[in-house]
Regions:
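Short, well-ordered coil/turn segments that N-cap beta-strands
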Residues: 1-3, 26-28, 60-67, 100-103, ...
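Acidic/histidine-rich catalytic cores of soluble enzymes
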Residues: 2, 29-30, 36, 128-244
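Active-site acidic/histidine proton-transfer and metal-coordination neighborhood
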Residues: 16-17, 53, 57-62, 75-173, ...
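Glycine-rich, proline-tolerant flexible connector loops at the mouths of alpha/beta enzymes
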Residues: 31-56, 110-115
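Conserved, mostly hydrophobic/aromatic
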Residues: 5, 22, 30, 59, ...
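C-terminal helical cap(s) of enzyme catalytic domains, especially alpha/beta-barrels
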Residues: 274-293
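Boundary/entry segment of secreted carbohydrate-active catalytic domains
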Residues: 1-13
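Catalytic domains of carbohydrate-active enzymes, especially glycoside hydrolases
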Residues: 18-36, 101
Length: 293
């Protein structure tokens, strides 16, 4: 099992300096999430050949590897034009991953819950177009359900990935999304079985708690949700132990399943103490998963 850091809280750090920073924090692997100067959210990648070469050189010096590249594009819409653009962005991102020697790419179902059938149709179209690219480069694509995607439930997400029926497509369990996935950590991860190749580590509060009043969000007059708009999804990416994720069940189930994939620390909540947070969560994982690299 490899422990990686999503360095999103350090995104202002120049890319060439990032591997050294990650190594100084005690990590040897990076999950590279969107950066404006490399692969931005929902836009065409910015990285050119010189950028990639410089980044590879800095990775080598720091003895750090990129184990996962995480792009986010609208491959499930909304709309065909957005989907086609997303496929173009994906293809360039796959090229970048291949040039970096990254073995897997991680993303979300995307789309939205307001029209799940339409989003699913667009998603299948994108997968049909992109699978040959993943096959050509030998890169795994790992998918997780995210709050406000067209699929949010963990069991439904596993069923969808199983239905893709491709050896290069697998499932990621994102701990801070636990409560939108249905709350059953052991059930979902066991149901995924061999499809579970990646997990995200961060804590979150249970939005369902206290009769649904854990969070109170006022939208417009009277606090109602306008027609055609789904309620807001609220979650956090906190340090282990700061929320309500059942970590004994999470780590205990992964041990029982003999999980041997990528475990990424993806804390977003504490930019003012990003270094301390990154070190703390690495120590917590090593304490709970002895032998993890």
């Amino acid at each position: 099992m490899k422990i990686a850091l999503d360095p999103y809280m350090f995104r202002s750090t120049p890319l060439a300096e990032l591997p050294g920073l990650v190594a100084a924090l005690g990590y040897s692997a990076i999950e590279l999430s969107p950066r404006e100067d490399f692969i931005p959210f929902y836009k065409h990648p910015r990285a050119n050949t010189a950028d990639i070469r410089a980044f590879k050189a800095s990775l080598k010096v720091a003895e750090v590897e990129v184990v996962t590249l995480l792009p986010l594009f609208r491959w499930a819409g909304p709309g065909e034009e957005a989907r086609q653009a997303a496929v173009r962005y994906w293809r360039r991102s796959i090229q970048i991953a291949a040039e970096l020697g990254v073995p897997e790419m991680l993303s979300e179902f995307n789309g939205g819950p307001a029209d799940p059938a339409e989003c699913e149709a667009l998603f299948w179209r994108s997968m049909a177009e992109l699978l040959p690219d993943f096959e050509r480069e030998g890169i795994r694509v790992v998918i997780e359900p995210h709050p406000n995607d067209f699929i949010e439930d963990g069991f439904a997400a596993v069923d969808m990935i199983r239905g893709i029926n491709h050896p290069l497509v697998s499932f990621s369990y994102c701990a801070p999304h636990t409560f939108y996935m249905g709350g059953d950590i052991a059930g979902i991860t066991e149901y995924a079985g061999d499809l579970l190749t990646h997990v995200h580590v961060a804590d979150s509060f249970d939005f369902r708690g206290s009769s649904g009043l854990r969070y109170i969000v006022n939208i417009g007059a009277g606090g109602g949700v306008p027609n055609g708009i789904t309620p807001p999804r609220i979650h956090q990416h906190l340090d282990i132990g700061q929320g309500e994720v059942d970590w004994d069940t999470f780590f205990g189930t992964l041990k029982r399943l003999q999980f041997d994939g990528v475990m990424t620390v993806c804390i977003f909540a504490w930019e003012e103490r990003a270094r301390e947070s990154s070190v703390f969560n690495l120590q917590e994982i090593r304490k709970r998963m002895p032998g993890a690299a």
